[in-house]
Amino acid sequence: MKKTIISTLVIGLVSGCSNTNLLKDNLASEQSVINLSKSSNEAKSRNIEFLSGAYLSERKVPKHDIKFSGKYVEFESKSPIELIDVLDGLSKQYNIQYVFSDELEDENSEENKKSSGSSSAKKIKYSGPLAGFFDYLSSAYNMHFEFGHNNLVKAYHYKNQVFNLQQYFDDNKFSSSMQIGGTSGTSSGLKGTADTAIESNSWEKIDEFLSASLGETGKFTIFEDYSLVTVKARPDKFLLLHTFFDKLINESKMQIAVDYRVVSLSEERLNQLAAKFGIENAGKYSITSDMVDAISLSQVGGGLGASYRSASARLDAVVNELSQEVMHEGHFIGIPNRVMPLNVTTNSKYISSIETTKDTNTDEETRTVKVSDLVTGFSMMVMPKILDDGRIQISSGFSRKQLVSIGTAQGITLPTVDENESMNTVTMNPGEVRLAMLFKDNYIQNSNGVQLLGGGTENKKSARYIAVLVGASSYKTNDLASNRVNIYD
């Protein structure tokens, strides 16, 4: 056989085999190696499976393994009967084997007295497919049925299920604090203290929900490190569980882009804009969300076109028309119910006290100088939430501290600072722009002062308005792992 192959190759070369034919042979050889490698990889990958849902432990038996799936049943009881009597009838008629695989715990508990079970008698009336009859019995008796091979039906008082949330929740405990600001208050679920902070922890929410929902006999375990939740409860509890987890999963697949601008403008500018857009009460005017809407719609209509749904584009349009100075701007991207923090601060040192100590024996004086920190700048926290109707609710905290002037007295530094802090909640449609907060800023500047957030250094008292504008958009992420891949086809 070897001789034949070698001889054939020699003949091919002598007869002037072209380079093209040699190239084809090489390609065919390479393709053969590639196909062999693919087959080897597929054989090694048969233990890998991408899940289409969050539920690991619910095993579905293929239809061809349920030999009675195509049969029809009519069942009607003239008086209430227990589940065991129903299963006895099915066993005789359709040769179905059944077994009760667990027992009802604490049968005398208030929960189990109110709930159905295998010992509860019910009036039964059903006509339809035999496989669907078990769904009917599950609802009537609050039982869970699993179908095995050889026509075996297992009846459970409790259902066990593992919820896998790994692809939806990572390390999802988030906290944020404002590095500046000292006023206190509480608004919209935000916690305001001397160290203003927001914290979000989905696992705590899941724990609270399960504790309140599973009843006296329900049990659950949360494995945060593996993002798994195991639940054992009566079957009627799982509809609520599925609704709850599906909502969390759907929210975690959403991403929210939040844009913000902190702008300043004068009272004169406000009056001009009020007159331009026909807004009344210009003499005592302060900016309103109506003006923001009017500017936004006007600018969009003026040619933004495809950018209509872009919150960033609409926000820029509002800022260009409205503001005299952009103090801060930023862009957050995250998922719902997660804190998005921003701290832009400057830490300065100043002499806060001088202590003099005199030695009575030597008349020598010792001076101790104490230096303190002064943090100025800007802090912001944003926590977005997607409502059931698709709108976006943004809870935000804003804190700003600026150094107005510095004086001295007997060697001690006397800084004058201006603080503003606010917490609020705004609700908007995706792509819209809203006024998050507004405050009037009166400040005094002198030649020795230091003005941190804009402005000059003239010796006069000035007034301006500081506005925080927020825009948000939401979109659904493409999660390849959520698509089921059947590697056996």
Swiss-Prot record:
Q: Does the keyword Protease apply?
A: no
Keyword tags = Cell membrane, Lipoprotein, Membrane, Palmitate, Signal, Transmembrane, Transmembrane helix
Give TM segment ranges.
174-190, 294-308, 402-417, 442-457
Say where the lipid (N-palmitoyl cysteine) is covalently attached: C17
The record places the lipid (S-diacylglycerol cysteine) at C17
Localization in the cell: Cell membrane
Span of the signal peptide: 1-16
Task: Give the main location.
Answer: membrane
Asked whether the UniProt record includes Cell membrane among its keywords, one would answer yes
Q: How does it sit in the membrane?
A: Lipid-anchor
A GO CC term? plasma membrane
Task: Summarize the protein's role.
Answer: Involved in TCP pilus biogenesis.
- Put simply, this protein is called Toxin coregulated pilus biosynthesis outer membrane protein C
